[in-house]
Every structure is written in structure tokens, then in C-alpha cells.
Amino acid sequence: MKGRLCTWGSMTALMGAFCVAPCFAQTLTWLGTLDYRSSIATDVSDDGSVVVGIAYTPNYDFRAFYWRNGRMEPIAPPRWLGWSQAYGVSGDGNVVVGNMMDSVGYMVAFKWTPSAGVEFLGALGGVGGTALAASYDGSTIVGWAEARNEDRLAFRWRQGQGMQALGAPATSVATGVSADGSVVIGYVNPPGVLLAFRWTEAEGVRMLTGFGGSNIAAQAITPDGSVIVGYADYPDHTRHACRWLDPSQPPQDIHTFSDSDSSQSTATAVNRDGTIIMGQYWPSSGVFSRPFRWTPQRGMEDLNTVYAGLLTNGSSLFNVAAMSPDGRFIVGSGFNARTGRREAFLLDTRVPCRAHSGDVDENGCVDDADLLAVLFAFGQTGQDLGRVDVNCDETVDDADLLTVLFAFGQGC
């Protein structure tokens, strides 16, 4: 806890802090392309400091990238001439996963850390594979690997234990994993269809239900493994983004655009408690996909509309690939009009903190409700405290309490 209750003699100094407290703005950062033709972002660390993805050359060769502190760098060392793609990063930002061409020309699953470099994860009797997601600390990695018969099999790789097939029927891919590595999601691919699954060590593979159509895919999972998002088809081939709150029950259709505006959408990212979902939809009258954010209160919103003020004239966002568990940081790709190319982006959606005079609940009256709100939050620190951080100094302390006390009764 920062500070302590002050003496009345220090009130002037405390109130002065009210005037110089910082405020923070929402930002859209185009990440660059490694001087190549284009780039896409595929994942982001929990604190938004690390972004990974793929950069494409003019000949559409591809290189995995790692972006941190405003700088994009290739994953593999310069001597590496093969292709590479980064699909996931651990929550702590220390482990990157994807696939990379090995010395004999096969694309194989890898993990990479800044300290140890590249480590190949092996296969399941075959030669190829791809790692798609990692647990919070990177000790558990999931994806697909080739079997001896060249089928793709969903796997879970664990530090010290190696790669394990999940036992999903037919061709299968693991697309996501919970923060502790205990819950895995993905899909199986019998001829002509996709069928989503959820896996745990206790229950094995458990198939998820959809809306009666041919294809169901699970694409993202909350850190605790309780909520899954993806898409499901209807019999008329309409595809809607959806949310599974219970793996034994049908999903919730979260597509709130009218069919005349869009009949196709997929969910690709979900926040910590499953109340914010990101993905993309395809406008009925358009060519390119557009990103959406869904909440129970507002339904689907086009990010190009919500964050229009951050987009330069002619720029647009195409898709969302991932977001941080608190919903603050969003990554994907779009068209950067300034450079004239498709680029990976990092969107920081943090609402600016605005210092105020003590009306915490904004009801026009500074009263006991405002005072109690600050008292109950007293000692909390962080960037997203809300209006209880009256002076926006990232700490609820005596300065905030005194601001409310000085204004007590105003507007009532």
C-alpha cells in the first residue's frame, strides 16, 4: 500500500497532485513487416508487451516474428534460411511456438525462448507438425503432429514429458490450452466436416455440439478452461460465432448482426471470464473480413467503428487473432494506409483515466456512496482502478479520500 493517512498540514501538497496526475490514451500501433511485403499478428502476451506473428516476403515466403518494446525481430537466427511461422506465445511472453523448416526441409513444431533459442518438439511417428498455443508459463504446448500414416494428430507437449497424442478420432488439431495446461481444445476433421472437442486428462476427448450444420470449431479458451469460443454452422451453411459455457450443452449464438448485413462470423479470442469475445465477420456486401468485439451488453460491434478515431484515412482492420485476458490488448492485421500494405497491429483499448472532483459514481452528488467506494478500494494499485482512483495516480490512497471529503455534499 502506497502512502498513509496524512496530517491536515499536508493537504495542499496532496491536492496539488490532483492537477498533475497522468492520463492514458487508447493507441493503435502498426508493428511493421520486417521490411517484407506484409505481416499478421497471431498472439499477444498477457501484459501486451510481446506480440508474435508472421511476416511475408514479396515471393510469399514467410518468417516468424517476435515484437517487443517497439521492435520487430525474426525468430530464427540470421543463418536460418528456412520458412518459419509463429502462432502462439505464453502468457508471460517468454515462450513462442509455431512451425519452422528443419535442416531437411520439413515444417516441424518448435518452441523458442530469447535465452535458449529454437527447440524442435518432435512428432508422433511422422515428420511434420505445428505448435499453435502455449500455457501461461510455456511448459505445456499444443498443436498437431504427423503420425506414421501422415495423418495429423492433436498433441499436448509438456516440459520433461515430451509429446503426447490426445486420442482424438480421425485427423485432429489442438488449437488452444488453458493457462495451467490441463484443458485443451481443438477439432477433428473426418472427411468433409469439422467437429470441435474439449480434452482433459480425466475425461479424454469430449465432443462439443453445435447448431446442426456440418462444421464446428473451438478456437479459443479462457485461462481457467471454463469457457470456449469458436464457430458453428447451421444446416443452411450460415456460420456464426458462438460461446460454450458448458461443454455438455449447445453453444450460445453470439452473432447479433442481421443476416442482411452478415451471415458469417467466427470467434477467435476470449477474455478471462468469457464476457468479451473477439473475432471477425464477413459483410454481405464486402470482400474483406472485419473484426468484431462482443459483450453481453452491446452485442457485436465493428472495431473499425468503435476505434475509428485511431485509424488514419484509408486504413482499416481486417481481423482479430488474440487478446489479453483482461481484454485490454488486441492483435490482428489490417491495411495501413500510410505504408500501403497489410500489417500486424496492436490495439491498446485502455480507457483514459480522467481525474475528477470526487463524484465517483457520477450521480451528480458527492455523498457517502462515493466515500465508501474509495474506502473499500483503499490501498489498491494498478492502471485500471476506475473512478475510485480519483486523481489517476494508479493508487487509491489518502489523496483520493481527501478529494472526496473536501467535495462532500456538493451537488446533493
Question: What does each model-identified segment do?
Answer:
Residues 9-22:
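Bacterial N-terminal signal peptides
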Residues 1-7:
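N-terminal secretory signal peptides that target proteins for export/translocation
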